[in-house]
C-alpha cells in the first residue's frame, strides 16, 4: 500500500534516526514514483538505501543505475554514495556489496574469476566474461564455486574508496533467454495481488 508506506516513511523522517531502506530495485523505483507525485522527503543523516535482487520481471521498467541513484538521491534527500547495490545469488550464499564509489568488492574469503564464455579460460582484469564466484562460506554445500550467466569484469585499478579488496563490474547477462532467479518470486506475488 503506497499511501501507508509514504506515511510510515514520513513518520520515520520526523523521528530523526537514520533510516535503512532495503528492497529490490523495481519496488524502490515504484516508491520513487509515488514520491515524485507527493513530493520528496529528506531522510535523516546517515540513512542508507540498499537494493539487491535485480529487476527480474520488471525489466521493462529498468532504468540505468546512475539515473536510479540520482532520482533516489533527489527524492530521498541522501547523497548518492549512501545509495548502494548488492549482488549475489541463492546458490552462492555470499553477498557482494557496493562501496561509496559504487564498485562491488570481493570479500577477503571469496574469489571472483572472469571466464571466457566459449573456452572457459580465465580472463585477465579488464576483460569481460562470465563471472565465476568462489567461497568457502558454506562448506556443507556442493556450491563452493558457481559459474553464473552474468557478464562482468575484474577492475584492473584499485578502488578510489580506499578499500584494498579486488572489485568487479557487472556488464550484462549472458545467454539467449532470460534466467528467472529467486528474486522473481517477489515480483510475481505482487503482480498477482
Predicted regions, residues:
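Active-site glycine/GP-rich loop and adjacent strand/helix microenvironment
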Residues: 1-193
Amino acid at each position: 500500500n503506497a499511501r501507508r508506506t509514504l506515511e510510515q516513511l514520513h513518520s520515520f523522517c520526523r523521528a530523526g534516526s537514520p533510516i535503512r531502506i532495503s528492497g529490490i530495485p523495481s519496488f524502490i523505483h515504484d516508491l520513487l514514483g509515488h514520491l515524485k507525485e507527493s513530493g520528496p522527503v529528506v531522510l535523516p543523516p546517515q540513512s542508507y538505501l540498499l537494493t539487491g535482487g535485480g529487476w527480474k520481471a520488471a525489466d521493462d521498467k529498468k532504468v540505468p543505475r546512475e539515473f536510479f541513484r540520482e532520482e533516489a538521491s533527489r527524492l530521498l534527500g541522501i547523497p548518492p554514495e549512501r545509495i548502494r547495490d548488492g549482488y549475489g545469488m541463492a546458490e552462492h550464499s555470499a553477498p557482494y556489496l557496493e562501496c561509496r564509489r559504487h564498485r562491488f568488492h570481493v570479500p577477503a574469503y571469496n574469489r571472483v574469476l572472469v571466464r571466457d564464455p566459449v573456452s572457459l579460460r580465465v580472463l585477465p582484469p579488464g576483460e569481460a566474461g562470465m563471472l565465476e564466484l568462489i567461497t568457502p562460506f558454506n562448506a556443507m554445500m556442493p556450491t563452493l564455486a558457481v559459474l553464473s550467466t552474468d557478464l562482468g569484469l575484474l577492475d584492473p585499478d584499485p578502488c578510489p574508496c580506499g578499500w584494498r579488496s579486488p572489485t568487479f563490474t557487472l556488464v550484462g547477462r549472458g545467454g539467449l533467454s532470460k534466467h528467472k532467479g529467486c528474486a522473481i518470486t517477489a515480483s510475481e506475488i505482487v503482480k498477482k495481488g
